[in-house]
């Protein structure tokens, strides 16, 4: 993907070079016009911005087109994300890459790898739009790895975010799952079961139901051990 981006940039700057040459020849034959030069510089700047914006928009659409694979074929999703984003140096793109790869690793059950991807990022530099997915997947991975204190620290440290997340169409199911894990990790099985049944009813989407299937086994085992 980076190669195509470079090609677009090269073509743009070739056009700019030709235009600059033509403008230089014109101004050499006529009276020097500062206004024309200033206008040309503005055109160059705005053109460069437009090229970047169009490329990133195209890239975003291609990433979005891979989304169905995240649930059905996470390995293919990972390959697609790496093909699109793996060689792009932009910090924002690499943040998106790591967050998306971590989500795919969670789908595969490779939670240690998900943690590796997420902890490689500086959370202070992650845009607000990605904060929910970042912290939710990190908490989920920590819970699955048995690192309950670290998982709860993630949730407690971002309490306002997780409260808002409960009503999110995209992340509400995951937030509900995490609330069950949280109660279970604190030893409150009664509350955990209560939240579990509420999540079953409120979030019928396949992804949440799949996670709740796993969680049910955990709760049943904990309940049996307590008897």
Question: Which role fits each region the language model picked out?
Answer:
Residues 56, 91-94, 128-131, 168-171:
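Residue signature of alpha-solenoid helical repeat architecture, marking inter-repeat boundaries
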